[in-house]
Amino acid sequence: MKAGERPKLVRGVRQESRRFRLLVIVVGFFLVSLTFVFVSKPDAILFSLNGKLPVEQAPTSILIQQKVNEPSGESRKTSTDALRGDPKVVDDEADAKPKGTGGGSEEEEGRVLSEPDPTSGMMEPTHNKDGNGHKSHQETLGGGGDGESKGNDEEGEHAEQKHKVTLPTVSNYTIHDAAEDTENAKQEGMNNVQQGSKPLCDFSNFRANVCEMRGDVRIHPTATSVLFMEPEGSQRDEVWKIKPYPRKGDEFCLSHITEVTVKSSKVAPECTKYHDVPAVIFSLTGYTGNLFHDFTDVLVPLFTTASEFNGEVQFLITDMALWWTIKYQTVLQKLSKYPVIDFSKDDQVHCFKHAIVGLHAYMEFTIDSTKAPHNYSMADFNRFMRGAYSLGRDSVTVLGEYPKIKPRLLIIKRHRTRMFLNLDEIISMAEELGFEVVIDEANVSSDISRFARLVNSVDVMMGVHGAGLTNCVFLPQHATLIQIVPWGGLDWISRTDFGNPAELMGLRYKQYSIGVDESSLTDQYPRDHEIFKNPISFHQRGFDFIRQTFMDKQNVKLDCKRFRPILLEALDNLNP
């Protein structure tokens, strides 16, 4: 190597070394910056790389939007009820027997939640046989309480086993929402809803789907279809499937309900009968024939849906139960001035300007006044029932207003299950406090009008948890309902079924939960048994066990000394 070339080589190496160090510094700085971005805001890189929107901006399906936008109150109820997991404890023992006057039959009550039969395991919802051969629960409105009529026990035993069903809880509705939307109330062509127009149907309610149309509506019962006529040029193309009975998500119940197709159309059969009033379409199968469900599934929702029309509305009934319409004809005639149309036997094409398919329903035996048309409430329903049966008392009698008249106490008497074992002692205590005591059984053979008048004549009504308490709808304002809760951790069920509705109707409500010593279960289990230490733990065994143990096999012996303050408080409520 020449002497002059070495210094040049050394300078070249140094320059390359500086470039390399500079490159290392730049790359290092880039890596440090990238690491910082990944750690602090990883989504800024990930979403920009894969082209996806952040979660809060990503579009959601209609079903997801319905769930997300659901009111927080309903969401909370859904989660809590679902965690409970137990069917509501409904009433009662069933003695199904056909009733001649109704052309059908009425089943025993069954309690608000469910009451499967121990022999058959499940009890089916009532459904038509040859039009009106309906099996129903013994506890119906006209006598709601026990589901028992004297002399009918053995005769009804066989029929009872055929028509028992596990009645669903509120949580069932929400748990099965997805199944309902895809199976029992699926809509086709939802994407074809015309932009800017309201869909024909609203499937967002967790308990009931409802369709409502204004315009040229053609109802063709033979085809079980409701057609909404569209003008030429309209882009609307909707098809909905709906079962007009408010037990959304209860697939077993809805399997007995006729499905009605609601669709928009430019072609339809010619009208054969024109109506100047709106139409309301609903079903009478499901759990009708059960006192509590007659109200919570039909009468309360029907009032909520149809009351605004002041009688100028036409009812069309799918799955007709003739005996039911006869039993409740006073209520039906108060809501509609027109004879009901039997969907299954009508071959006309009825044309309306306004039609509603399905009934507005919310929680059990309750109207949500924030969502109901015209903000109807349970107080309005209570007033409506008193008016329908022409009941004389709108409010209780103030103590002292009529010195010779004693406050009246109605005790709902039961047989076979949840009986008062010391009824005479209870009567004596109540009379000692100044009550005039009336004892009655709210059974299937009771005349509704008579029983309504009896309930309306009293100031206080009491009874052990059961469908007979549904008759509180006839009580005057500010009357007191006292519910005796059997042993077994049934407090929340009892309040949900009757306590909350009673208070919403403007009644005073007292709930008395019996102690261990007041339960006949002490005759069946030792006092140190877990059933007394932790009854809630037995709910995990399912409703069959709950019903058989805490409902069917338990009677009540009230501790009159402990119960006395409840009656005294009811008396105080009658003071001005």
Swiss-Prot record:
Q: Does the keyword Nuclease apply?
A: no
Q: Quick one: a GO biological-process term for this protein?
A: plant-type cell wall organization
User: Could you list which ranges are Cytoplasmic topological domains?
Assistant: 1-19
* Top EC category: transferase
EC assignment: the record states 2.4.2.-
Pathway noted in the entry:
Glycan metabolism
**Is Glycoprotein tagged as a keyword?**
yes
Q: What does this protein do?
A: Glycosyltransferase involved in the arabinosylation of xylan, the major hemicellulose (non-cellulosic component) of primary and secondary walls of angiosperms. Possesses alpha-1,3-arabinosyltransferase activity, transferring an arabinofuranose residue to the xylan backbone.
Membrane spanning segments where?
20-40
| Any coiled-coil regions, as ranges | none
- According to its UniProt record, where is this protein located? Golgi apparatus membrane
Its primary localisation, in coarse terms, equals: Golgi
Protein name, as recorded: Alpha-1,3-arabinosyltransferase XAT3
Q: What is the lineage of its organism?
A: Eukaryota, Viridiplantae, Streptophyta, Embryophyta, Tracheophyta
